[in-house]
Amino acid sequence: MKRLAVILITLALVSSMCITNSNEKRENMKNAKVLMVIAPKDFRDEELFEPMAVFESNGLKVDVVSTTKGECVGMLGNKITVEKTIYDVNPDDYVAIVIVGGIGSKEYLWNNTKLIELVKEFYNKNKVVSAICLSPVVLARAGILKGKKATVYPAPEAIEELKKAGAIYEDRGVVVDGNVITAKSPDYARLFGLEVLKAIEKNNE
């Protein structure tokens, strides 16, 4: 009987510790913000809205920015109004940067020196850096993929950009290498969001 009582008390203590740790994690994440970057035109809709839903449902705040303020239009016709640009961003305000893909990424994001600079800052501050579809090319051009496993939308030009930057290209849906997360296409948008969330939680333990 005594033995059973000891076991029950031990289980209760372990359960209490797990609940406390879970509450602490939620508390740590409560004021955390994720920066999502989109092209002003032709961003890929699912790659914005599906990860955003994952982040917000887990208590994270999300700021969406672009290269210009105002209405941004996705490839599928969804619209979102952004009130800040990448030029207004302070990396210290965020736990992660997520660069959304779509065909607009090549035109508006690949060569954007400010965005490339932001990626470097997030990476050097040990924050989570992530990109999906065509946008891992931005990470490649920022020089943070050298020696890292990564994926990208399977367009020859995009794959070549990663290899040229020294990345270990993998033809997989989502690739995680430390704080760097890349995804291949909108088919993996939700899984990508979940992996970014995991990395944020790990970084904020």
Swiss-Prot record:
Domain of life: Archaea
Gene Ontology CC annotations of this record: cytoplasm
UniProt xrefs under InterPro entries: C56_PfpI-like (IPR006286), Class_I_gatase-like (IPR029062), DJ-1/PfpI (IPR002818), Prot/Nucl_acid_deglycase (IPR050325)
SUPFAM superfamilies cross-referenced by the UniProt entry: Class I glutamine amidotransferase-like
Family annotation (NCBIfam families): PfpI
Family note: Belongs to the peptidase C56 family.
Name this protein carries in UniProt: Uncharacterized protein MJ0967
Species this protein is from: Methanocaldococcus jannaschii (strain ATCC 43067 / DSM 2661 / JAL-1 / JCM 10045 / NBRC 100440)
